[in-house]
Regions:
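Bacterial signal peptide processing site
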Residues: 20-22
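A short beta-strand motif characteristic of beta-propeller blades
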Residues: 41-48, 89-96, 136-143, 184-190, ...
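C-terminal motif of bacterial Sec signal peptides marking the signal peptidase cleavage site
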Residues: 15-18
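A short helix->beta-strand "capping" segment at the edge of beta-propeller domains
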Residues: 30-52
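Structural motif
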Residues: 71-81, 117, 121-129, 167-177, ...
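Short loop/turn segments that connect beta-strands within beta-propeller blades
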Residues: 84-88, 131-135, 179-184, 219-223, ...
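Residue position within the beta-strands of beta-propeller blades
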Residues: 64-68, 113-116, 159-162, 203-206, ...
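Repeated scaffold domains used in trafficking and secretory/extracellular systems
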Residues: 50-60, 100-110, 146-156, 190-201, ...
Length: 360
């Protein structure tokens, strides 16, 4: 009788397991292999059924990210989805309008979600925003083949991007644009300008004038732009948050000096300090900063205009690391099938670091 009961229970289990195509993802909690004996970095591992993932955010227990599904190549991350970590179910938010699409630069400011819909083998790309509560989607840019946009960013309901136009012509130019998600109005805040970053009510961008580089700082509330002098080197803006910006200075590549130094600048008064931070993938958020290499993540604590290294954590085969909101960082691990005879498998692993739970 016991054997019959056990058999019936086993059959019921198999039947229930076969109902539905969604299964809960594999999640584990592990402690990072830290170089410090005092700090404990516990992170959550989540494995999701996609060939590749980009720009993941963590919103209310769901991963909002761009993914390449089993029927696409690993670079064709054409679906923007909301993935429930607990159940493994997901909803499609947006599908790329391109035959070979790649959704990039997903950002969220607490109300508005934005992204860049890019064509893999062309410069065609357009920016979209969505009211996360109502799910209403608006296409912000509608550019032709002679124009291109850079990575968008958002703060306080205003989207910023650098736009290059008259590409291929005799007068190729760039400008910094801003779009108000509430009023749906677009305006130019700077004629000329490169990479733009935004956070906490401000946007920062670099402008080259006569061989000198300045940092433009746009205040969303006042609508005014102030300029901070940087120098005559080559400068790359990395990120902007909490009234500060990170940028990388490359001395003089034209003269063979490609040495680099990372700086942090106070956007209110222009005071700078050397930021002892790896420039690769450097991101600034709240009281922290993070950068990544192919085999490690580096976490930093910000105290005013100073950054100090918390720890470097070995995290093998890091493809990317992004700020996911609320002092959370997500590292995306390279697909386990990369470089093997079997090729890419339909699974991507991510590590979720919650710095709010950092213990000493």
């Amino acid at each position: 009788m016991k054997r019959v009961s056990a058999l019936i229970l086993a059959l019921m289990f198999l039947f229930l397991a076969s109902c539905g195509t969604d299964t809960a993802p594999e999640t584990t909690t592990e402690q990072a292999n830290s170089a410090s004996t005092d700090l404990k970095f516990d992170y959550e591992t989540v494995k999701v059924p996609f060939k590749s993932v980009s720009s993941p955010l963590l919103l209310d227990g769901k991963l909002v990210m761009a993914v390449a599904t089993a029927d696409r190549t690993e670079t064709d991350r054409r679906y923007l989805i909301s993935y429930d970590i607990g159940s493994g179910k997901y909803d499609n938010i947006f599908e790329s309008t391109h035959e070979l699409g790649d959704i990039q630069s997903i950002r969220f400011d607490g109300k508005w979600l934005i992204w860049n819909d890019c064509e893999i083998y062309n410069s065609a790309r357009n920016i979209y925003c969505m009211n996360y509560k109502t799910k209403e989607i608006t296409q912000i840019t509608k550019l032709g083949n002679d124009s291109a946009v850079g990575e968008p960013c958002i703060s306080d309901g205003v989207v910023f991007w650098d736009e290059c136009f008259d590409i291929g012509g005799e007068n190729t130019r760039s400008r910094i644009k801003a779009y108000d998600c509430t009023t749906k109005e677009t305006k130019t805040i700077s004629e000329g300008g490169d990479k733009v970053c935004a956070g906490d009510g401000k946007a920062a961008f670099t402008v080259n004038k006569g061989g000198k580089t300045t940092l433009g700082v746009y205040d969303i509330e006042s609508g005014k732009v102030t300029e901070l002098a940087l120098g005559d080197g080559s400068y790359t803006l990395k990120d902007c948050a909490a009234g500060y910006a990170l940028y990388v200075e490359t001395k003089d590549p034209s003269r063979g000096d490609s040495s680099q130094k990372t700086w942090i600048i106070d956007l209110s008064d222009g005071k700078t300090a050397v930021a002892d931070i790896f420039p690769d993938g450097a991101k600034l958020f709240g009281d922290y900063a993070v950068s990544c290499t192919a085999t490690a993540l580096w976490f930093y604590k910000r105290d005013g205009g100073m950054l100090s290294l918390i720890d470097g954590l070995r995290d093998t085969n890091v493809a990317d690391a992004s700020f996911a909101g609320n002092n959370t960082v997500i590292s995306v691990i390279k697909n386990v099938g990369s470089g093997t005879s079997e090729g890419l498998v339909n699974e991507t692993e991510m590590h979720i670091f919650d710095l709010n739970k950092l213990s000493v």
